[in-house]
Amino acid sequence: MTTNLTFKLTAAAALTFCSLALQAEETVQTSEVTVTAGRVEQQLLEVPMAVTVVTNQEIQESAARNVGELLEDIPGVMVNNAGSQGLKRVSIRGEDTFRTLTLIDGQKISEQKSMSGASILIDPSSIERIEVIKGPASVLYGSDALGGVVNIITKKGSKKPFEAEGSVAWNGAGHGWAETISLGGTYKGLNYHLDAGYQSHGNIKTPLGYQKGTDFRQKNASAFLSYDFNEHFTAGLRADTFDSDINSSSWEYEQDPNSEFFVRIPKWKRDKVALFAEGKNLNEYLTRLRWDGYWQKNHKNMRNYVSQPNGRMKVVTDSLADNRIKTYGTSLQADWQLGESNFLITGYEFVQDQLEADTLAKTTMAPMLNTVTNRYVKGKETTNAIFASMETSLPQDFTLNYGVRYTWVDSKLSKAVGVKNGYAPGTKYNNAPDDKVGQVGSDKNSRPVFNLSLNWTGLPDTS
């Protein structure tokens, strides 16, 4: 045992030394990292917000199986796994997960059914980098960004005419395998990238043993294609799909022989098609004009099962959900250089989420005491927004940033049907209306948000 311990300590010290040596040789200068957190390409130190970047090199060197595991070591970021290896949501600076805006290439992953926040439905093998904005960014990104923003930038070609890579990885936490393959390149103005991956992981290993019902699988594929018509104009498209099968459980219930809890998500799938066109340096003032449009579908099937003792009875709640969200979005952004000291970003955004959700809930308290509730809702939320953000350079290394965003939201619940059948203590239900399904109707509201900040960059390599 002593020899074993000595060997481990020696090996750990050697690995630490090697790691430090490699870090010293491969240090990435922060000033060289380019980000788009401010909706325009900037050096990281020039961004007037608290931004952390997970680079492509860090992603490649990581053993992370999903985006949540890539973000869990960032200060100020907390990853909520909801009892599962494969289901991750992000909280920033203590805010709830639904106050974190999750974007893929600047476009929102919508979650309209729960208040748990959007799950990050993309594989790390498709990602070029991740930009995390810590703190409110409502003028540039809307009110969903009250806690912060996770913007995932996908891979888009390479500098060489052709590159290909593949990987096979094994993870001991769940005895799982992950395989990925990708190829891409640039040739005479044509930029392309293709990738695909598959992961399968068993129940997670913990100090208490293997936790049952925590296995997951996921698969993904994406394709990107763009063409540079000249030095000023580029257009392209991207299509991707991500599908997962996720299970979740709880040690608290597993250790109680009279209770049972599990969540099964046999299907959580995201499909997306996006188009863009961009012009750069169009005249003396207009430095960039970009249009984006996209369609996205988010489909989740879920079963939530809870069994608990209640006196001499056992209460069982078994719920099934089928949620479909279709999202249509478009945006137009113009960047202006107004003299040497003023840079203005203006834009318009449109997003419409269309939700359809079916829920079947069964509650059993005894053989003759059970109820079945069916609910169906259909609705949509339409958001229009205009925004403007100015950066003004002042003397003595000061920069003034100020902006405004005005948002119009139109929410409509067009169908809300709920019926209940069965027996409860002293009551019989026969297609009885369910008063918890909600009421058909619509609501409109609009409001502005503002920002004002003064930044000083007088110290080198700080922001």
Set out the residue ranges of the language-model regions.
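N-terminal Sec signal peptide and the immediately downstream disordered periplasmic leader
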Residues: 1-64, 68-74, 184, 219, ...
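Non-catalytic regulatory/gating segments with a bias toward low-complexity or hydrophobic composition
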Residues: 51, 59, 71, 130-132, ...
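Extracytoplasmic beta-strand/coil segments of soluble accessory domains associated
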Residues: 68, 72-108, 128
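Short acidic/polar hinge/loop motifs at secondary-structure boundaries
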Residues: 107-134
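Transmembrane beta-barrel wall of Gram-negative outer-membrane proteins
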Residues: 170-200, 210-249, 265-280, 338-344, ...
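Flexible loop and strand-edge segments within Gram-negative outer membrane beta-barrel domains
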Residues: 207, 232-287, 297-324, 373, ...
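Structural signature of Gram-negative outer-membrane beta-barrels, strongest in the C-terminal barrel
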Residues: 230, 341-343, 349, 377-463
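Solvent-exposed loop segments that connect transmembrane elements
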Residues: 249-263, 303-320, 358-375, 411-442
